[in-house]
Amino acid sequence: MAKEIFSIAAVFWILIPIGLVGGALLLKFQGD
């Protein structure tokens, strides 16, 4: 149980920054 929660948390810690950076880059390129 704890291992599943930890793995899910790790996935979110990886995906959220990638999503934020990707979204920022898309907005920047669209702005140009």
Swiss-Prot record:
The chain crosses the membrane at residues 9-27. One of its GO terms (cellular component) is cytochrome b6f complex. It is a single-pass membrane protein. GO terms for molecular function: electron transfer activity. It is found in: Cellular thylakoid membrane. The 4 large subunits of the cytochrome b6-f complex are cytochrome b6, subunit IV (17 kDa polypeptide, PetD), cytochrome f and the Rieske protein, while the 4 small subunits are PetG, PetL, PetM and PetN. The complex functions as a dimer. Component of the cytochrome b6-f complex, which mediates electron transfer between photosystem II (PSII) and photosystem I (PSI), cyclic electron flow around PSI, and state transitions. Belongs to the PetM family. This is Cytochrome b6-f complex subunit 7. It comes from Prochlorococcus marinus (strain AS9601). The lineage of its organism: Bacteria, Bacillati, Cyanobacteriota, Cyanophyceae, Synechococcales.
